[in-house]
């Protein structure tokens, strides 16, 4: 009846936009793709963060191998062991959080990491509760949210792309369970991530981590489909990076957050290099180096 009378069918129409939801994009526009960025940090600050990210409540019983990983990371922080990939990645996030950058991390197996290198979420072996050290870096840190997602690459990656296009200050990260599985979201990669800026002037700082390796798991687990991303690369629309040392991944992630350029970052993350004895760095490499 209301339709026949030409009356509105909704009780209230929004006449003015909610300006509190507006984002100031000015700081993130007009930058050259190769702009320099200082990703160094005071080594004492880094050592403090290294200690804090390996601290946990006394009453948290951990699985034996996880406890050993944290014990090794304490040795790495003290200089008694070289740093591996997982610890360098954790420190990159910790430094950004300390400086107030929010981080949103989503994927199918990200708390642990596909190849068990990350362990950003610690599980109590008795009551199944969890503890997330990166949420306890400092009192005024940026928000750190981490979500193991449903098994739909297309749905989750599309949502994270949208989130990243409206949240330029922080880092939005999506990790495939295996990089090859990203083809389940190929239409999102083709139509939005690699071409959205050119078509709609929508800049996006989304980071995609694509773990893969030739070590034993066969087809659909081995290449992260690198060739597809290279074919989609044109006019500096995306960054495709293949870091090979812990220091490189540390400075690469810090650069993605610190510098105001917002371009999608596609990371060909490895398997064997996560624990390779020759793929290590020192804490000085993290404090002083660059990507």
Where are the regions that the model predicts?
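Flexible, glycine-rich loop/tail regions that form catalytic "lids" or insertion modules at the edges
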Residues: 1-291
């Amino acid at each position: 009846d209301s339709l026949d009378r030409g009356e509105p069918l909704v009780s209230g129409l929004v006449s003015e936009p909610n300006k509190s939801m507006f984002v100031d994009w000015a700081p993130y526009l007009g930058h050259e793709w190769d702009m320099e960025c200082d990703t160094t940090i005071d080594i004492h600050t880094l050592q403090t963060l290294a200690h804090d990210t390996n601290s946990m409540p006394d009453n948290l019983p951990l699985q034996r191998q996880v406890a050993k990983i944290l014990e090794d990371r304490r040795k790495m922080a003290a200089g008694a062991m070289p740093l591996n990939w997982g610890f360098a990645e954790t420190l990159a996030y910790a430094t950004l959080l300390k400086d107030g950058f929010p981080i949103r991390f989503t994927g199918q197996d990200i708390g642990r990491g596909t190849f068990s290198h990350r362990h950003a979420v610690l599980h109590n072996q008795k009551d199944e509760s969890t503890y997330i050290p990166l949420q306890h870096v400092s009192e005024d840190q940026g928000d750190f949210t981490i979500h193991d997602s449903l098994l739909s690459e297309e749905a989750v990656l599309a949502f994270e792309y949208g989130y990243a296009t409206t949240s330029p200050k922080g880092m939005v990260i999506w990790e495939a369970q295996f990089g090859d599985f990203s083809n389940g979201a190929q239409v999102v990669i083709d139509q939005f991530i690699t071409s959205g800026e050119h078509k709609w002037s929508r800049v996006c700082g989304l980071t995609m981590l694509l773990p893969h390796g030739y070590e034993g798991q066969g087809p659909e687990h081995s290449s992260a489909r690198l060739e597809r991303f290279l074919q989609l690369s044109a006019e500096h629309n995306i960054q495709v990076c293949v870091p090979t040392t812990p220091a490189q991944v540390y400075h690469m992630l810090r650069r993605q957050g610190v510098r105001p350029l917002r371009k999608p970052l596609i990371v060909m993350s490895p398997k064997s290099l996560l624990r390779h004895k020759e793929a290590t760095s020192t804490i000085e490499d993290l404090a002083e180096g660059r990507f």
